[in-house]
Amino acid sequence: MLQPTLTSWVILAGGQASRMGGKDKGLIALNNKPLIEYVIDRLTPQTSNILINANRNQDDYQQYGPVFGDHFQNFPGPMGGIHAGLLHASTDWVGFVPCDCPRINEDLVERFCRAVTDETDILVAHDGDHQQPVFTLYHKRVLPKLTAFLERGDRKIILLYKECHTQYVDFSDSPDCFVNLNTPEELTQFGQLES
């Protein structure tokens, strides 16, 4: 099994948050606590190597850990954050989670590490029905392929998966792990459920 200490984990907070009215999702409060703090609280017991990908409000994010922006400036979505994470992380294995999922599994890092094989390039969480492409673990050897992928203007992640040795990690027993808050209505509803 890959040791969790040999991985870095990047919280993806670099999006435009258009469905949230352009507000920076990681900094939006849920029950008086920024969403990113929920993610950090879940990740911290699992790994000591947490980084943050943010393209706005970087000074606000720095209180939570090292921050870096995308290298591709045209907002290529989560793929831009994954690319930047692979460039900035000091480990060969780099995991990614979104900033707006307050119920990340307490064994997420371990599950990904257990699934690594010698051939693995990319691991992607699967909830039993769908793949969850922003819950993922990449080996740095994918970086040249990802760079070429983005330079071509590709955005469909499934195409990158086909270029690499991609495997899926079973999270069908914990679909709540992937609850994400994309709109003010979802945030309000979730806050009422959590109170």
From Swiss-Prot:
Keywords: Cytoplasm, GTP-binding, Magnesium, Metal-binding, Molybdenum cofactor biosynthesis, Nucleotide-binding, Transferase
InterPro entries, A to Z: MobA-like_NTP_Trfase (IPR025877), Molybde_CF_guanTrfase (IPR013482), Nucleotide-diphossugar_trans (IPR029044)
Enzyme Commission identifier(s): 2.7.7.77
Entry-linked CDD domains: MobA (cd02503)
Reactions catalysed according to its record: Mo-molybdopterin + GTP + H(+) = Mo-molybdopterin guanine dinucleotide + diphosphate
Keyword Metal-binding found: yes
A GO molecular-function annotation: molybdenum cofactor guanylyltransferase activity
Broadest EC class assigned to this enzyme: transferase
Residues the entry annotates as binding GTP: 12-14, 25, 53, 70, 100
Family matches, as HAMAP family: MobA
Subunit structure: Monomer.
Alphabetical list of PANTHER family matching this protein: MOLYBDENUM COFACTOR GUANYLYLTRANSFERASE (PTHR19136:SF81)
Similarity remark: Belongs to the MobA family.
Name of the protein in question: Molybdenum cofactor guanylyltransferase
Source organism of this protein record: Vibrio vulnificus (strain YJ016)
